[in-house]
Amino acid sequence: MRLNHKQGEAGEDAALAFLQSQGCTLLARNWHCAYGEIDLIVKNGGMILFVEVKYRKNRQFGGVAYSISPSKLLKLQRSVEYYLQQNRLTNVPCRLDAVLIEGSRPPEWIQNITG
């Protein structure tokens, strides 16, 4: 397994543990479709959260917040729409969030990354 993949998994593990500590329940992890991948799908109360996890060792290259490009955001939105269609989830409150992890700092939960 490549180092970046291992670090990515460790970042997802940390993000999941953080979200669970905030009361979230895991529905799916690394969910794939033709449009892309959703790192974590969790339920928080009555809301489904689609979570992009970003991990960086340090602030080099602008930090983790700069790693979610407009094209990545579009892929995520399309993946969310597809997930909702495939699971026949209509009129279910949902949101696209991000958990950013930078080095040894605590995770940062960005809610509603689509604005």
From Swiss-Prot:
TM helices/strands, residue ranges: none
Pfam families xref list: UPF0102 (PF02021)
A single GO molecular function term of this UniProt record: nucleic acid binding
Gene3D superfamilies xrefs: 3.40.1350.10
NCBIfam families cross-referenced by the UniProt entry: PRK12497.1-3, YraN family protein
Protein family membership: Belongs to the UPF0102 family.
Name under which the protein is recorded: UPF0102 protein NMB2089
